[in-house]
Swiss-Prot record:
Known glycosylation sites: N69, N101
Similarity field: Belongs to the PIGV family.
Main subcellular location: endoplasmic reticulum
UniProt GO BP: fungal-type cell wall organization; GPI anchor biosynthetic process; protein mannosylation
Protein name (Swiss-Prot/TrEMBL): GPI mannosyltransferase 2
Main function: Mannosyltransferase involved in glycosylphosphatidylinositol-anchor biosynthesis. Responsible for the transfer of the second mannose to the glycosylphosphatidylinositol during GPI precursor assembly.
Keywords, in A-Z order: Endoplasmic reticulum, Glycoprotein, Glycosyltransferase, GPI-anchor biosynthesis, Membrane, Transferase, Transmembrane, Transmembrane helix
Annotated compartments: Endoplasmic reticulum membrane
Source species taxonomy: Eukaryota, Fungi, Dikarya, Ascomycota, Saccharomycotina
Length: 433
């Protein structure tokens, strides 16, 4: 099964990179050429065959900021707004770059290789996570394997498309998110009577591995902070069942450590780096002697430089961006309904909460089209699609789909259209971002 998934992954990626190669070399935005002229000493290197027809095209949108941070002397951003781009990802890529090779193309090739390895490993981890979720007994084991295979294939066919051909930070969070969810799933137990519990022997995988993975995923991508809802859910369930000591030693401890790490990254480090000289957000301290401000540096950057905030994106000129996100909005909402109302599963209850929270936050507070790029760190919609595809595998049923199967069919057709289109748009430095 793993060999089959590997072959599919190689095939999908080869097609995408071929599309990048075939995309016209003239990009819509000039950021790439300006950056290359700044960082490359030799014009001949920029215009060499493979760089001109392939590698330069991968430096689009956020990749420009990532490669700039990765190739800087100390790995630190030059300007304030560049702190919005994961420092953890920058640090991780720099670990694999030879110290005596300062070529931007060497860094790019290493980053792309790491991107693909993490993307592939995330799909493999997701396969085993899916098997764990859906094989509650021996009779379901074959069904679980089928669901797991389709889920991983759908993950490889993500709507993030062209973004993941470059050096974006998402695959690092995908990997940590899936390992963290898998570790938690292996730790909890839900007996027949529904008494949620966590055995003491699973303290390490729950309170360390899951906590560490969720924390690293969140430090890398801020949307992954929603994974902390797992700890809130478990805390509520253990408290309801009067397992107070376990509630403290498992979810409360894990959640507190995760919160502390985020507090350190989002508030303490920026305050020590920029304040009080910076002014503006630095002056919004809740208390005069404490580093916690009303607005974190990341929130300030998102609001000040990219116009992120409640309903700020709800303008007529952004209607096309909402339309780009509609397929994923629909599939995420319907997957949360499917696993809470139609085929309710206690094991997926917390993930349903997280999925709904993601949709609300992105639709009302963020640039809504990024949902296409970030949604895959949550596998609920992939499980919904895979489950429906397995249950409607009869060709006659697919010819005349009914109800939510029409949604599934539409989404698959949309992916077949969107993935190659978005890959080409990305390589040409064209919207959507």
């Amino acid at each position: 099964m793993i060999v089959g998934l590997t072959l599919y992954f190689v095939l999908f990626r080869s097609i995408q990179y071929l599309l990048v190669f075939l995309t016209p070399i003239r990009q819509f935005d000039t950021s790439t050429s300006l950056l290359l002229n700044e960082l490359c000493s030799s014009p001949s290197e920029i215009n060499s065959y493979w760089n001109k027809y392939f590698w330069n095209k991968l430096l689009s949108w956020d990749s420009v900021f990532f490669i700039k941070n990765i190739t800087s002397k100390n790995g630190k951003p030059q300007f304030e707004h560049e702190y919005a781009f994961s420092q953890l990802w920058t640090f991780f890529v720099r670990l694999f770059i030879k110290s005596n090779n300062d070529s931007i193309y060497h860094a790019l090739r290493v980053g792309v290789a790491i991107e693909n390895v993490l993307f592939y490993l995330s799909g493999i981890v997701l396969y085993f996570l899916t098997k764990k979720i859906f094989s509650q007994n021996i009779r379901q084991s074959q069904f679980a394997r089928t669901i797991a295979k389709k889920t991983s294939l759908l993950f490889f066919l993500t709507s993030a498309a062209g973004f993941l051909t470059s050096i974006y930070s998402e695959p690092l969070s995908f990997f940590f998110a899936f390992v963290g969810i898998w570790s938690r799933e292996c730790s909890i137990s839900v007996p027949v009577l529904g008494q949620f519990d966590i055995s003491w022997r699973y303290w390490f995988p729950y309170s360390f591995i899951s906590m560490a993975c969720f924390t690293l995923a969140s430090l890398n991508r801020s949307n992954c902070v929603l994974l902390g809802i797992y700890f809130i859910f478990d805390l509520i369930e253990l408290t309801k069942n009067r397992k107070f000591v376990k509630a403290i030693c498992f979810p409360l401890l894990s959640g507190s450590l995760m919160f502390s790490a985020l507090l350190y990254q989002q508030y303490y480090l920026p305050y020590k780096t920029f304040c009080p000289q910076r002014g503006e957000w630095c002056k919004s301290q809740l208390f005069s002697s404490i580093f916690i401000t009303k607005t974190s540096l990341y929130s300030y950057i998102q609001s000040h430089y990219w116009g992120v905030g409640l309903l700020k994106y709800w303008t007529p000129n952004n209607i096309p961006n909402f339309l780009f996100a509609v397929p994923n909005i629909i599939i995420l909402i319907y997957s949360s309904i499917y696993f809470s109302k139609i085929y309710p599963s206690y094991n997926l209850k917390a993930l349903v909460w997280i999925t709904r929270a993601l949709v609300v936050i992105v639709c009302f507070f963020a640039h809504v089209q990024i949902l296409n790029r970030i949604a895959s760190f949550l596998p609920l919609h992939l499980w919904y699609l895979a489950d429906r595809l397995v249950k409607t595998s009869d060709p006659k049923k697919m010819e005349n789909p009914k109800g939510d199967d029409k949604i599934v069919k539409f989404y698959i057709y949309w992916l077949a259209f969107w993935i190659p289109l978005q890959t080409i748009l990305f390589a040409a430095f064209l919207p959507p971002a």
